[in-house]
Amino acid sequence: MSRRVLVRFVLAVSIAAVLVAVGALPVGAADRPATDSPADSGVSGPRIVSVYPNPVADGDVGEFVVITVPPETDLGDYSLGDDETTVSLPNRTVSDRVVLSTAPNATAALLDDDPLRISDDLALANGGEPVVLSRNGTVIDRLNYTDAPSGELRVASGTARWRAVGATDRPVVTGTAGEVTVFALPDAPAVATDSLASADRRILFAGYTLTDEAVADELVAAADRNVTVRVLLDGDPVGGMTRRQATILDRLTDAGIDVNVLGGERARYDFHHAKYAIVDDRALVATENWKHAGLGGNGSRGWGVVTDQPRIVRALAETFRADTDWRDARPWSEYRTGESFQSAPAANETFPTEFRPRPVNVEETRLLVAPDNAESEILDIIGNATDTIDVEQVSIGGRRQPFVQATLAAARRGVSVRILLSSAWYTKEENQQLVDWLNERANRESLPLEARLAKPRGQFEKIHAKGVVVDGDQAIVGSLNWNAVHRLLYHQSNYCVWSRLETTRTATKNSTNMRWEPSRNKTRMGSIVFRRNRTAKICDCMLIPLLTA
């Protein structure tokens, strides 16, 4: 049964490098994800790590409980129970992580563990109950849960109480001082293709869609010169996959490139909305899709960052491997069998170059991954604003959206706020209603806040960026939109940039102010991330570089 919701996704959030940490890889990788297990080292006694009470399979076949134990633990001394039943654990000597299942074969199909069988007298309630671990009748640990979502784990620790099996729980990763290159679209499409063309060893390519032939040309050329190329895309984008993309993916596969798509019954995330590439020891993170209207430079206003900070690149590569090397990543040749594809024209407009790529010194960079860690980080950034907040978004999910509420709270404490939304036909009416409400609220409460719809004036076709600039020196660049769908359903990355140099601030400002006040050359540039919800997941990443002298 698919978890996808049709209205979810006008955006493209996945990859914004913003705050992400080296997190565990999915089950089956060298390091297991915190999805199923906290740190196993240093456990003073047996503990419940997670429970899986509501399997997707009919009849809830495959319920399991994960525990951790000290080395050489005699499991026969322990029992597991709920509100109705207590069952003895197998008489085995075990260490570290142990998976206990009423149907080991079904559980083994989800995990790389060798589950131990327990009596099926223990049936976990979907509506919730306590799960109790006891030793010789004495309770030593307890995990409570309510309203178990289908196919998700209740975890004892981490950033979310519920998580899809195999989903990651990555911490925020911070990079030290260095230099990044910031660029705007449609002004500088060559940054993306030139980055791919420079590859000597590897390209790890992540996206929501891929329909730009120029990008495909560089991927094939890289493979021809023996560069390792891996591609990961969403398997079921809103509106369906296009014939153009299917043709490109056939071509990449024929060139020997490893192409995978995410989706299917075991999908950990409703969408893979990332937009990034790791080229050798550099990472490119953008707000735009790999298509003509996006990174191809033929339409959308967007932002991007290129960095070679080792911690950031390494963490993003780990995220890529975690997303690619699990069971919901399907080879393109397998996925395309029996599929139908949609026709869609490619954007072909041209626009002037107003903003050229610029190198910027960074004091610090943080990588965020959604749904793992991005929401709380972004709320903290907005909550700590003292001077200004500039927001540029395709759309916003409504008046009660958490980032909107945090921004209103900032305005109430005297922070000057500007919000610029897309005027594209598919979101204009909804955005205008929100703009009117925000301005009315600002007028009624005498808040330093103003909201507008963008007027492209020939500089671009539409806003597709997802950006926030705080206090003039911190920008978030990534694929996360400020709408409810993206907060709840996608996997993404984001990159946050902070600059205390006037020249650096100029580099990150021009793109927004040119749309806010055409007579003044003061635009800010940035992009934001999204939030995680227990019932819906979207894969995104974001980068937050703190730029300074």
Describe the predicted segments one by one.
Residues D74-T85, L143, V285-E288, I476-L480:
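Catalytic Cys-His active-site segments of thiol-dependent hydrolases/isopeptidases
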Residues V27-T85, A123-A125, D147, T174:
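A structural motif detector for short, solvent-exposed N-terminal "entry" segments of globular domains
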Residues G23-S50, V56, E152-A255, D270-H272, ...:
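Charged, low-complexity intrinsically disordered terminal segments
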Residues M1-V13:
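N-terminal Sec-pathway targeting helices
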Residues A12-V20:
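Bacterial N-terminal signal peptides
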Residues D58-V61, T86-S157, I463-A465:
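Solvent-exposed beta-edge/loop recognition patches
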Residues V51, G81-N91, L111-D120, L232-D234, ...:
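N-terminal post-signal-peptidase region of extra-cytosolic proteins
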Residues P71-E72, N91, N105, D112, ...:
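N-linked glycosylation sites
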